[in-house]
């Protein structure tokens, strides 16, 4: 009984204390206490200064102050209009004059090029292994370049190989295979071989056969349709001048080649993109087996893969355009060994070869750099080796660069942002009411398995 009485008294005492601490307050008083109470986040309300709404007129006037010359408007040059002040302050040094489009990406790219070359110099200086010697020899070779006599020797050896193969029409696949071994020239061949991750299963590498790239970046130049006559005439005149200088540099003034054959061949190749009759996969993913390639297209995948260097023919390759595959095969089988195509084959080789010689590179630059892209200066001489090193030692350079310069904070930030975006889009699709159930199901499945690689993949192909 005594304990019960004591508890009741204590309870009454507590209630009395509460009443003393928190008397009846008005709504405004409670808010004031809550604002200043030590365990509550500070609000920004009390820090806001009253703003005279008449200042709106002054603010509007500030926005009207021009920050670009009057001739630059969002309508005629949006890029310069937005970035005028940055462009005005950003200056290229002498070694960066090859850059034609001034932006932060290209300036950072230049910085990365320099850092890669420093990695090469440091690695070869501090290591004495087979790889370090290979990298060192390659770097010195690229820096020194090839002499004119070496250029002529390599060009004539390749031309002799082409002529030997032309003696038998069946050697088409051998020629394509041998030339596709070299990535520096293979991109311009009628059939360009590559090994890429499978578009439908990135963990597996597949063989891809795709059209090569034509020389002229404006495909309208391959059409004689009566339009832009002055522009096309001038462009082709510059192109033929470049081709003639190229062949004279390598084979002498009396080289005997008709350089206009190169343009004519590329006109034929461009027309192949208009071929029809085959049904293509909408995602440019057409699996072509060795048997189908030979029986339906006349494309000898077995021979081509053998001369590329495969000991065993891959069961299939992937083509982005079956119509091109069909029509180009027929064109090559009919014409590849003609004089016109002889000029084209050797052109694919020597246009890259001359870039290894200082004087030859100037010929290449005058057309491809100065005329086509508007470069005011060639790539600085000591920067040149970085491009060849990128082909020969790509995995090594990537791994070394990441080990030295990776910023984990940036990587983590981008990963988090990407995951947040993935979550947002997943929710949007989940709430969608108009998609077909099956389509919605597959879309969500893709989001679930979607992976974004930032920096570099865990493993790189050597």
What are the roles of these predicted feature ranges?
Residues 67-88, 227-247:
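Hydrophobic/aromatic-rich, well-ordered segments within soluble, folded domains that form packed cores
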Residues 111-421, 457:
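Noncatalytic, helix-rich "gating/capping" subdomain that lines the substrate-entry/channel surface
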Residues 1-35:
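Compositionally biased low-complexity segments enriched in polar/charged residues
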Residues 399-462:
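Long, K/E/R/D-enriched contiguous segments that form extended
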């Amino acid at each position: 009984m005594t304990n019960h009485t004591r508890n009741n008294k204590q309870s009454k005492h507590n209630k009395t204390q509460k009443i003393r601490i928190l008397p009846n307050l008005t709504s405004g008083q409670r808010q004031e206490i809550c604002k200043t109470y030590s365990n509550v986040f500070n609000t920004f309300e009390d820090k806001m200064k009253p703003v005279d709404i008449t200042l709106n007129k002054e603010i509007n006037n500030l926005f009207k102050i021009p920050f670009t010359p009057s001739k630059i408007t969002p309508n005629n040059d949006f890029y310069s209009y937005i970035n005028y002040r940055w462009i005005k302050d950003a200056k290229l040094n002498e070694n960066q004059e090859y850059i034609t489009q001034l932006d932060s990406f290209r300036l950072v790219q230049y910085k990365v090029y320099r850092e890669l070359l420093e990695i090469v110099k440091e690695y070869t200086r501090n290591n004495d292994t087979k790889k370090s010697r290979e990298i060192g020899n390659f770097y010195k070779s690229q820096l020194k370049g090839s002499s004119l006599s070496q250029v002529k020797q390599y060009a004539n050896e390749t031309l002799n190989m082409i002529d030997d193969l032309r003696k038998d029409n069946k050697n088409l696949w051998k020629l394509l295979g041998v030339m596709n071994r070299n990535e520096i020239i293979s991109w311009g061949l009628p059939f360009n071989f590559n090994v890429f991750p499978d578009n439908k299963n990135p963990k597996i590498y597949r063989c891809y056969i795709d059209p090569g790239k034509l020389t002229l970046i404006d495909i309208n130049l391959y059409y004689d349709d009566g339009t832009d006559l002055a522009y096309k005439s001038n462009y082709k005149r510059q192109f033929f001048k470049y081709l003639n200088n190229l062949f004279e540099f390598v084979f002498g003034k009396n080289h005997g080649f008709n350089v206009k054959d190169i343009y004519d061949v590329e006109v034929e190749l461009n027309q192949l993109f208009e071929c029809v009759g085959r049904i293509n996969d909408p995602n440019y993913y057409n699996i072509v087996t060795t048997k189908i390639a030979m029986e339906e297209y006349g494309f000898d995948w077995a021979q081509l893969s053998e001369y590329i260097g495969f000991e065993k023919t891959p069961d299939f390759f992937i083509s982005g355009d079956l119509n091109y595959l069909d029509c180009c095969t027929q064109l090559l089988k009919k014409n590849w060994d003609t004089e016109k195509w002889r000029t084209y084959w050797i052109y694919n080789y020597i246009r890259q070869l001359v870039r290894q010689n200082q004087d030859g590179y100037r010929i290449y630059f005058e057309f491809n750099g100065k005329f086509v892209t508007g470069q005011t200066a060639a790539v600085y001489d000591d920067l040149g080796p970085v491009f060849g090193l990128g082909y020969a030692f790509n995995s090594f350079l990537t791994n070394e660069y990441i080990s030295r310069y990776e910023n984990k904070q940036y990587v983590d930030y981008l990963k988090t942002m990407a995951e947040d975006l993935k979550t947002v889009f997943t929710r949007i699709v989940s709430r969608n009411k108009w998609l077909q159930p099956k389509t919605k199901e597959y879309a969500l499945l893709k989001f679930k398995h979607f992976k974004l690689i930032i920096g570099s993949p865990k493993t790189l192909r050597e």
